[in-house]
Amino acid sequence: MQGSVTEFLRPRLVDIEQISSTRAKVTLEPLERGFGHTLGNALRRILLSSMPGCAVTEVEIDGVLHEYSSIEGVQEDVLEILLNLKGLAIKLEGKDEALLTLTKSGTGPVLAGDITHDGDVEIINPEHVIRNLTGQADISMRIRVAKGRGYVPASTRIQSDDEERPIGRLLVDAAFSPVSRIAYNVESARVEQRTNLDKLVIDMETNGTLDPEEAIRRAATILAEQLDAFVDLRDVTEPEQKEEKPEFDPILLRPVDDLELTVRSANCLKAEAIHYIGDLVQRTEVELLKTPNLGKKSLTEIKDVLASRGLSLGMRLENWPPASIADE
C-alpha cells in the first residue's frame, strides 16, 4: 500500500548468508534512494573501527629479553611469534583481561589449542599456528589478553611507571577489532510500483568471535546513539527555562477599585483599610457586616462581583501580604 509521500521506508533484515565460519553477507532492504550508500558507508566505518573485541597486549617468553631475539630450536624469531599471537581469536566472558600460559616441548607446531586457560576464556581458532619447534626445545610463555576496541599501538600504552616493568615483558600492538574485512554493495530494490529503491548488501569477514547479525546490531546502535545529539540539538544548546510560578494570583494584587463596586461599598472597604482584592477575600461575611454603613445589599454585591472572577469571601492566603505590597 502506497503511504504518504513524506514517509520514509523502513528497511528490514532480509537475509544472512553464511559463506564460511568467518564470513557472511547481510542484506537489508528496502531503502530510500541514496540511503544505501549513506548507511552502508557509515556502518562500514563503525564496523571496522568500533567493534569491541579481545587482543593480546603483553607477552613474556622464558629466556627472551627483547623482541629482536631468536630462540634455539624454534623456526620463527620473536617478532614472527608476536605477529602470530596477534592472529589469536579469543573471547572473554565476565572479565576484562586474562593471563594465559603456553608450555610445550619436543618438535612440531605449537597451536593456539595448546594454550592453558580457565573457563572464562574461549579460543575460537585452536588450529592457529603460533610457532614451530624444529628441535628438542622447551618453550614457556605467558600471554596477557584484554578487551578493547580499535587498534591501540604499544607505544600509546607506555606509561611513566613502565620503567619498573620487568625486562622481557614485551608489549604488543593490540588489534581489538573482530572485523578483519568489510565491504558493501548497493543494488536495486522494488516495492510495489516503486523501482528506484536501494538494497544494501554488507559482506563481512570476522575472526569468528562476533556474529554478523550482532555486529550489524551493535554498529547501528552506536550510530543511533551518536545521532541522538542532533535529534536533541535544541535541548543541548538551549537549556529549558523553568517558569517561576507567581506566589499569588495576579488578580489578588489588584486594587479593589478594579471591582467597580458602588461608591457606597467602595468607601466602606477603604474605611476598613481594605485596599487590595487579596485583602477583601480574606474577610468573612460576618466581619464585613460589622463594617459601618455596609449592609446586606452591599455584601451581596461584593459576593457577586467576586464570584464572577472565581473568588469568594473567607479565603486563606498564606504569606499575605507579599513584599511588594507590604513595602508600600
Swiss-Prot record:
Secretion signal span: none
A GO cellular component entry from the record: DNA-directed RNA polymerase complex
Catalytic function, reaction form: RNA(n) + a ribonucleoside 5'-triphosphate = RNA(n+1) + diphosphate
A Pfam family of this chain: RNA_pol_A_bac
Sequence segments annotated as region (Alpha C-terminal domain (alpha-CTD)): 248-328
Entry keyword Transferase: yes
GO molecular function: DNA binding; DNA-directed RNA polymerase activity; protein dimerization activity
EC number, as in UniProt: 2.7.7.6
Keywords linked to the UniProt accession: DNA-directed RNA polymerase, Nucleotidyltransferase, Transcription, Transferase
Location of the region described as Alpha N-terminal domain (alpha-NTD) in the Swiss-Prot/TrEMBL record: 1-234
Major enzyme class: transferase
GO biological process, one term: DNA-templated transcription
Recorded family membership: Belongs to the RNA polymerase alpha chain family.
Quaternary state and interactors: Homodimer. The RNAP catalytic core consists of 2 alpha, 1 beta, 1 beta' and 1 omega subunit. When a sigma factor is associated with the core the holoenzyme is formed, which can initiate transcription.
This protein's name: DNA-directed RNA polymerase subunit alpha
Organism, as annotated: Shewanella sp. (strain DB6705)
Recorded name of the encoding gene: rpoA
